[in-house]
């Protein structure tokens, strides 16, 4: 009887230790996955941010179009355009549009948001990008915090939300000074135009803004 109790105790201890080991392995695997996700997200943000900084030149002959043309392909590569497009007009409106209307809007939205970012940095020289860190965001997203430092001026806080799209982390929103969501800002801005002119009216309005951006230099 005594031997049986010892055997049972040993078996119970073995089961507990096995459970602890499995939990430990699960936590380790999750930690490794989290580190890989953070590293991948950081790489995306750093690539775009460095491209944004590089688009600003001290050479006065560099035009808005030069900066725009340099940044647009990097924007398209690293931003989740489908998420951005749907979020900036709202799910109900988005689902009412045809595939071709959605595609046309994504194309002009990419150019409009790129142009907006180019204009934000056009008047300041001496930009320097600093990566602050990454933290978990809502709905399995990640938030990457960065600074755009400027000569003799306060740095600009730029935070990026990233979501996984097709197994790859992509930027789905930008927050200026940790508060102003680019998606929320554009949705509020576009809503009136959509109500009065629909998809075609919004396309025309954005094309007009892009023309004004280029004319302003």
Q: Where in this protein do the model-derived segments appear?
A:
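Short beta-strand edge/turn micro-motifs at domain boundaries
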Residues: 155-185
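Bacterial N-terminal signal peptides
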Residues: 14-25
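Early exported N-terminus immediately downstream of N-terminal targeting peptides
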Residues: 38-117
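Surface-exposed, charged secondary-structure patches
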Residues: 106-107, 111-156, 206-217
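Boundary at the C-terminal end of the N-terminal hydrophobic targeting segment
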Residues: 28-35
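Low-complexity, intrinsically disordered terminal/linker segments enriched in charged
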Residues: 175-217
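Bacterial N-terminal signal peptides that target proteins for export
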Residues: 3-16
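Surface-exposed, polar/charged faces of alpha-helical domains
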Residues: 36-43, 54, 58-62, 66, ...
